[in-house]
A protein has these predicted regions:
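Conserved short histidine dyad/triad with adjacent acidic residue
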Residues: 25-44
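Structural motif
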Residues: 48, 55, 80, 88-90
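Short acidic-glycine-tyrosine-enriched beta hairpin
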Residues: 60-82
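Surface-exposed loop/turn positions
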Residues: 36, 71, 79, 87-89
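A short, N-terminal "cap"/entry segment at the start of jelly-roll beta-barrel domains
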Residues: 1-29, 61, 119-126
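Glycine- and acidic-residue-biased ligand/ion/polar-headgroup-sensing regions
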Residues: 43-62
């Protein structure tokens, strides 16, 4: 998981992260090894997630769902999710990136909220 100041998971040996950029699109690849748990950040925008390898359980306020690759989900804004890997899994988040920003810290500020209060403030100012 991230920290209070930086809620998004960062690259590590336990959870390798890769970043890909295309015109107007940012894709974040996260590898989760067997029995890894990741607490996701609160995303500000509707986006699509793809599971291209593995088997995950994804818990949110809506409940717990299991996903086996290959599949995708539409991720609603304002949701916080917890992911559990039953086996090594590769998960992709796709985000709009209209300004083609490649600075990861700046992208994260645009994509995720630090906490629910930050998310509510974002919604009010939208």
């Amino acid at each position: 998981a991230g920290t209070d100041e930086k809620p998004i998971v960062t690259n590590s040996k336990k959870v390798p992260i890769n970043h890909f950029f295309m015109d107007g699109v940012y894709v974040r690849e996260m590898t989760m090894f067997k029995d890894t748990v990741v607490i996701g950040a609160i995303h500000k925008h509707l986006h699509m997630c793809f599971l291209l390898k593995g088997h995950l359980a994804v818990a949110s306020e809506a409940g717990v769902n299991e996903y086996k690759a290959p599949c995708y989900i539409i991720a609603e804004p304002g949701e916080k999710r917890v992911l559990y890997a039953y086996e090594e899994s590769v998960w992709y988040n796709t985000h709009k990136n209209e300004d083609n920003i490649k600075d990861i810290d700046q992208l994260e500020k645009n994509i995720v909220a630090v906490n629910y209060e930050d998310y509510e403030q974002y919604i009010k100012n939208k």
